[in-house]
């Protein structure tokens, strides 16, 4: 299938990018390729979101909540499990299915992605999907993973960890960490470099990624060469400090989109409060669920990306600033005009392909160090 945009737009994104400073952190800003209006939504995203935003303007608050009820989980899974990307990868990518045995005897399904032109002793991207800890699957992010593999000739592994609320915290988290250890132990068998493992995840997967890195450091294994956090959930307890406090006034929104976007952002921010119930724990202040609270200066190199109109934008940029202040080698990319989960739109939004390029460049650059 062909891209739903011209490659000229991809080039425009790179031509129009600029660097700004946000609370001491250097941020690479990717402007909308075909719109210069400040605070505008990307026209492709607006086309997809217009009806939803209009509906939300008149929807009562009691209909906009996220909890562990069967109805809520079913609705969230229906929303998060849809595949929005279209295939644009032309290189043959071999996909191998394996399982990883947990301490309680469960077999975690994983997928290994291997291009026909794979590098010898290739760096490994270990990707953990998002979905609010209770939805999503490797299918949703598969085109992003395959695109990175195509552009870099590295190896990739994705994991289908157990989901809440059926499997409460920390089961999903430990599944992901168990898989990380398996990748290290078996890397050479599938042609990967165990000393160049990069863990990545989107949204809730970003939280799971940071968990893997933190546990890896605590256990003294040092398996993680770098981490890539795509619009991650890293401040579940909404902890405020010199870098972070959430306010709708911190969003730049053009008048045309203001009512709809402000309602959407406020709702999404308030819905995040239901995470404790979904995960089956009240321990959301811990460094594992809210890593923003306790930043370790010894974290490996970190890549962060977030959209200008993402409800997590404020905490993601605050996290980048906090990591930078602690001395962590941090690269941050902000996409103007986008919201949440644009990694799920490969072949549809040019920014999704640009993200794959940025992630690949980060991995290749740091794997040489």
Walk through the language-model features, giving the residues of each.
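A domain-start/cap signature at the N-terminus of enzymes
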Residues: 83-98
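Alpha/beta-hydrolase superfamily serine-hydrolase fold, recognizing
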Residues: 2-41, 94-369
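N-terminal targeting or regulatory segments adjacent to alpha/beta-hydrolase or S9 domains
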Residues: 1-87
């Amino acid at each position: 299938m062909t891209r739903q945009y011209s490659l000229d737009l991809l080039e425009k994104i790179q031509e129009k990018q600029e660097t700004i400073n946000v609370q001491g952190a250097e941020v690479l800003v990717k402007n909308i390729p075909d719109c210069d209006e400040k605070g505008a939504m990307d026209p492709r995203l607006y086309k997809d979101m217009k009806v939803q935003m209009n509906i939300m303007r008149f929807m009562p608050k009691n209909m906009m909540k996220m909890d562990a009820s069967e109805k809520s989980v079913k609705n969230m899974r229906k929303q998060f499990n849809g595949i929005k990307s279209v295939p644009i990868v032309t290189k043959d990518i071999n996909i191998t299915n394996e399982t990883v045995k947990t301490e309680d005897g469960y077999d975690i399904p994983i997928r290994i992605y291997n291009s026909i032109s794979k590098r010898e002793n290739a760096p490994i991207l270990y990707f953990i999907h998002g979905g609010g800890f209770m939805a999503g699957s490797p299918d949703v992010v598969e085109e992003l993973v395959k695109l990175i593999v195509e552009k870099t000739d590295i190896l990739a592994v994705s994991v289908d960890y157990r989901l809440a609320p059926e499997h409460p915290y920390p089961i999903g988290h430990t599944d992901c960490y168990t898989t990380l250890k398996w990748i290290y132990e078996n890397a050479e068998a599938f042609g990967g470099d165990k000393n160049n493992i990069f863990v990545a995840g989107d949204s809730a997967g970003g939280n799971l990624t940071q968990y893997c890195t933190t546990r890896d450091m605590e256990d003294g294994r040092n398996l993680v060469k770098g981490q890539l956090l795509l619009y991650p959930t890293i401040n579940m307890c909404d902890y405020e400090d010199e870098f972070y406090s959430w306010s709708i006034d911190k969003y730049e929104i053009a008048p045309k989109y203001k009512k709809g976007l402000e309602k959407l952002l406020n709702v999404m921010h308030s819905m995040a409060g239901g995470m404790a119930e979904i995960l089956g724990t009240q321990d959301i202040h811990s460094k594992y669920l809210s890593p923003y609270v306790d930043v370790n200066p010894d974290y490996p190199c970190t890549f962060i990306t977030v959209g200008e109109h993402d409800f997590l934008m404020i905490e993601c940029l605050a996290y980048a600033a906090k990591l930078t202040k602690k001395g962590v080698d941090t690269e941050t990319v902000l996409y103007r005009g986008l919201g949440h989960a644009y990694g799920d739109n490969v072949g549809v939004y040019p920014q999704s392909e640009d993200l794959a390029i940025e992630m690949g460049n980060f991995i290749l650059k740091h794997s040489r160090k």
